[in-house]
């Protein structure tokens, strides 16, 4: 499914004023553009919307296959598809989280529910993860699978109509690293499947994409900052590469050595702190 409005070719046909309106850049106070002119943000924001749209299209496609396997009772296939499917959600989480109702339905963890796994509103990926990896069953999971697929399709529709706030886009890089620091390094995100490294990679890829798209604007303000961020991303990538499997996936998180977990803490926390200043550097606070 494609959205003509989101293609760069279509966007570039618009007048400068129309572009600013389409991408929400006139909703930002004029004082916010002390560091970066509004038109300088048009390209990065439009490209990021395309990136998010493409990832959500993949999310819908992969979720269809994942939920089909769950409904067929094919536990082995469902387990295999669980983590690779989630990557597409994790990479665009800052935008997905703008729809709090869907985020809670798609990605809430057992800790978010007072009644735990018995809670009626505990749905989505992690509820299916619990059934597949903790209980080793797909029994009675059909309705949850159907709801997950319905929710990601709803997300796709909402994102297509969304005006991307530039401050949310830029702030998303830090949000993704904070997510890694808070739940990925500890291994609590995917506690039943231990597939946290997939989520980890999705968060890192999403943050890198934002940095890369805004790189010209960042380097115009602070070239040393850009180099420091790249160095810390490279450190994280080097550690993650140790645990990649031949099929392009990752080892389970319980196989990550303690010294590597500790080695990830420094660069991840530094990235989260540094990227939290990015909005200010671009005048988007």
From Swiss-Prot:
Keywords: Ion transport, Iron, Iron transport, Metal-binding, Periplasm, Signal, Transport. Gene3D superfamilies: M75 peptidase, HXXE motif. The keyword Transmembrane helix does not apply. GO terms for cellular component: periplasmic space. The keyword Electron transport does not apply. It is found in: Periplasm. Pfam families: Peptidase_M75. GO terms for biological process: iron ion transport. Residues 1-34 form the signal peptide. Component of the iron transporter efeUOB/M complex composed of EfeU, EfeM and EfeB. This is Iron uptake system component EfeM. It comes from Pseudomonas syringae pv. syringae (strain B728a).
């Amino acid at each position: 499914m494609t959205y003509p409005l989101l293609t760069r070719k279509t966007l570039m046909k618009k007048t400068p004023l129309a572009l600013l309106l389409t991408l929400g850049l006139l909703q930002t106070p004029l004082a916010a553009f002390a560091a970066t002119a509004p038109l300088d943000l048009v390209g990065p924001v439009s490209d990021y919307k395309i990136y998010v749209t493409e990832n959500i299209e993949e999310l819908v496609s992969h979720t269809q296959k994942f939920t089909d396997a769950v409904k067929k009772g094919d536990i082995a296939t469902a387990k295999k598809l669980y983590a690779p499917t989630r990557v597409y959600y994790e990479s665009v989480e800052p935008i997905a989280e703008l729809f709090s109702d869907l985020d809670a339905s798609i990605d809430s963890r057992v800790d978010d529910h007072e009644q735990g796994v018995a809670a009626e509103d505990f749905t989505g990926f992690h509820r299916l993860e619990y059934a597949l990896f903790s209980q080793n069953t797909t029994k009675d999971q059909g309705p949850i699978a159907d709801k997950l697929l319905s929710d990601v399709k709803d997300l796709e529709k909402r994102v297509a109509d969304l005006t991307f706030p530039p401050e949310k886009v830029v702030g998303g890089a830090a949000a993704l690293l904070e997510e890694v620091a808070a739940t990925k390094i500890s291994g609590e995100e995917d506690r039943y499947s231990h597939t946290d490294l997939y989520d980890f990679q999705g968060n890192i890829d999403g943050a890198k994409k934002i940095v890369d798209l805004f790189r010209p604007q960042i380097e115009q303000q602070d070239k040393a900052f850009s180099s420091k961020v790249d160095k810390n991303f490279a450190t994280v990538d080097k550690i993650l590469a140790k645990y990649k499997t031949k099929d392009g996936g990752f080892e389970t998180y319980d196989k990550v050595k303690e010294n590597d977990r500790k080695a990830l803490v420094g660069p991840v926390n530094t990235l989260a702190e540094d990227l939290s200043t990015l909005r200010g550097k671009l005048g988007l606070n």
